[in-house]
């Protein structure tokens, strides 16, 4: 995958982005990720069945275009990805959309769940997620 389709170039420019090399021959300049083959494009409301779990696809754009979350209503789990996490929510990356991010925060205030697995940091509960969303909406508004 070409760097222009990722943010890899930003991480290569930050020596602290990788704490230590996985082996002596590893080089961040030569590192490449091979994309998994596309099986299908997911859309709002689609279901993903894993055998023992079912996830509803929820469109959560703003941080990055096309971001999704996965909601397991039976277990109360929300896989939120980079849509929300502790700390300053980033809405100024290439491809970010602050207006769409505000709509995502509004949406997250309405979703019922027990715990959210975020793309960064620890698992959070619904109360903390809603506090983060409200803080973003208050500061961005």
Q: At which residue positions do the language-model features occur?
A:
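General structural signal for secondary-structure boundaries
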Residues: 3, 35, 94, 112, ...
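Short, glycine/charged-enriched secondary-structure capping and boundary segments
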Residues: 5-8, 75-76, 93-95, 130-133
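Active-site HxH/HxHxD metal-binding segment of metal-dependent hydrolases
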Residues: 1-47, 138
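Generic beta-sheet signal
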Residues: 1-3, 80-81, 119
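Catalytic core of the metallo-beta-lactamase
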Residues: 28-104, 110
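Divalent-metal (often Zn2+) His-rich catalytic cores of metallo-beta-lactamase-fold enzymes
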Residues: 71, 77, 100-141
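Short glycine/proline- and charge-enriched loop/turn segments
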Residues: 23-26, 84-87, 132-140
């Amino acid at each position: 995958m070409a760097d222009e389709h990722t943010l890899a170039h930003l991480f290569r420019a930050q020596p602290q982005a990788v704490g230590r090399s996985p082996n002596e021959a590893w080089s961040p300049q030569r590192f490449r990720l091979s994309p998994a083959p596309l099986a299908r494009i997911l859309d709002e409301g689609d279901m993903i069945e894993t055998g023992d779990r079912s996830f509803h696809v929820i469109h959560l754009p703003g941080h990055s275009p096309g971001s999704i979350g996965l909601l397991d209503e039976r277990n109360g789990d929300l896989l939120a990805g980079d849509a929300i996490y502790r700390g300053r929510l980033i809405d100024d990356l290439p491809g970010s959309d602050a207006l769409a991010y505000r709509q995502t925060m509004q949406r997250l205030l309405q979703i019922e769940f027990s715990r959210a697995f975020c793309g960064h940091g620890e698992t959070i509960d619904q109360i903390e997620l809603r506090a983060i969303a409200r803080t973003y909406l208050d500061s961005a508004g």
